[in-house]
Every structure is written in C-alpha cells, then in structure tokens.
C-alpha cells in the first residue's frame, strides 16, 4: 500500500490524493487483507470498469457499441467471497465449474449470463447498444438475472469511485496504476 500512497501523493495534489486514497480505503495502516481488497477494488475500477465505459461511450457509432456488467459476487468461501471481479465473470461465463456453484441461484445466473453472451456473439442483440443514454445489461448482485439499466442507475455500485476518477482525470489515475506496477 505504501507504493500506491507514495505514487498517488506524487501525481496528485494533497487534497485530491487524500480523497482518492480514502475513497478506495487505501492506507499504509491497512492489514494485509484490507490492503489486498483495497488494491483489488482500485485496479478493478480503473483497469476494467472505467475503460469499458469510456471505450463504449467513445465508439464512433453508439448504436454499434454494447456494454454489459456482471456484478455477481464470488460464490466460493475464502478471502474474496462476495466480491465481483473480472475473473468471477469468466468463471460464470465459461461454466466449467458450474457443477460446483453452491446454490441454484448461482447456477441460474451463470446459465443466463453464458447464454446471453453466446446469443450476442451469434448476432442476437439481447444486449442493447449503449446509445446516448448509457444503456447496458447487468447481472447481479445477489442473483439478479440479466436486466437493462443505465449508467445513471449505478449498475456497478461504484458511482462514488467512478465519479471521482472522472473528476481527477483518468490519465492521472492510470499514471498512479502504472507507477505502482513498475515500482521495484
């Protein structure tokens, strides 16, 4: 965590650094488990969620850009149980461990998600274009099946974090990530 706090303080002014670090609960005083969770959220928001939204919004023809959000948490016991991350969506998407999902709700949302992606890949537009309204299809949390939402409805449950990144500037925050990843 010291690396992230040091890089953040080098890239941003004091006030912005304090807000960013507190929003993501990043502190040198974190326990190892807290540090991993805070870093995971920071990198998930900035490495996956924010770029996906920005790329979809920047697409030259918004009727040809589609965005989905898989926000179902990890169903398996352990440190990351309940957390929705990029690897969890792949776990549900590919269905290779579906027989190990602990509940029928997990199995059902996995099938719904996987079939929607397969259909979409075969030209069935069951995931609407993002358009000017920021429309996307969302699965989860808590077993909620795929449904249509807009970005204004906070489908990722990360509005505070995403708004802050937008305010500070995506490239500055990516600079913090890059500084962390290249630190010794």
Model-derived segments and their meaning:
Residues 83-132, 138, 143, 164, ...:
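C-terminal structured subdomain/cap of oxidoreductase catalytic cores
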